[in-house]
Amino acid sequence: MYIKILNNHLLAFFLIISIVFFGCQQQGSETAETNKSTRTAIGDNAVYGGVLCVSDEESFRSIFPGKIEDATSAKIAGQIHDGLVAFNPKDLTIVPCIAKDWSVSEDQTNYTFELRSNVFFHDDECFENGKGRKVTAQDFKYSFELLCSNKFEVSYNMFIDKIAGAKEFKAGETESLVGISVVNDSTITIKLKEPHTSFIYNLAMPNSSVIAKEAYEKYG
C-alpha cells in the first residue's frame, strides 16, 4: 500500500512540474514571437552546436532515466530523452511520441505499441561507424529491464509493482522481464499484473525513456 501511495504522490508531483515547465515554455514561445522582428534582423539561419546556458534554482542530480528522482533532473531529461508516449504541453493529455499508435486489451492489462520507423539515436562513437541506428522495440525492452533491475537503488520504481514479472526479474529469479515482449522491430507489448490507470502516464515520464544498449555499455 505504501508503494502505491508513494507512486501516486510522485505521479502528481511530476504532473505539477510538467505544468510549470510547459507553462514557462509557452510563455517563452510568446516572448520569442514578440522578438521575431529582432531575430529576422540578425538573420534566419539556424545555428547548430555551441553551448546553451540555462539558469535554474537547483542543480540536477542525474539525467540518466534510471536515476531520475528530482524535479530539476526530470525537467532537463525531458528535453533530452524520448519514450513511447509524451504529455501534450497544452493540457497534459497523453500523445504519441516514439510510439505512433497503441492499443489496450479489454481487461486493461495488455498494452501494444507500434513504433515509428523514422526515429534514430544520435550519432555517437558507441555505434558502428559512429552512426546512430534506428530505435527498435528491443531497445525499449532493454531499457525497461534495466529500469526494473537491481542496478539502480532509487527511492521508488513505478514499474516494479505493475509490470508482470518485474519483482521476480529484480530479484534475479528470471533472466528476462516476462511482462514485456518484442513482437518485431516495431511492435512491443507490455503486460500488467492488474489494471493501473496511471500506467500510461508513467510511460510519459523521463524515467521511461529509451536508451541504447551500446551507449549504456560504453558510458554506464
Question: Model segments located where?
Answer:
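N-terminal lobe/hinge region of extracytoplasmic solute-binding protein
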Residues: 55-106
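Surface-exposed binding/hinge segments that line
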Residues: 138-141, 146-215
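Immediate post-signal peptide segment of exported/extracytoplasmic ligand-binding proteins
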Residues: 42-53
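A structural "hinge/loop" feature
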Residues: 58-74, 98, 125-129, 156, ...
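Aromatic- and charge-enriched surface segment that lines or borders ligand/interaction sites
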Residues: 100-156, 189
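C-terminal motif of bacterial Sec signal peptides marking the signal peptidase cleavage site
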Residues: 20-23
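Bacterial N-terminal signal peptides that target proteins for export
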Residues: 2-11
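Bacterial signal peptide processing site
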Residues: 25-28
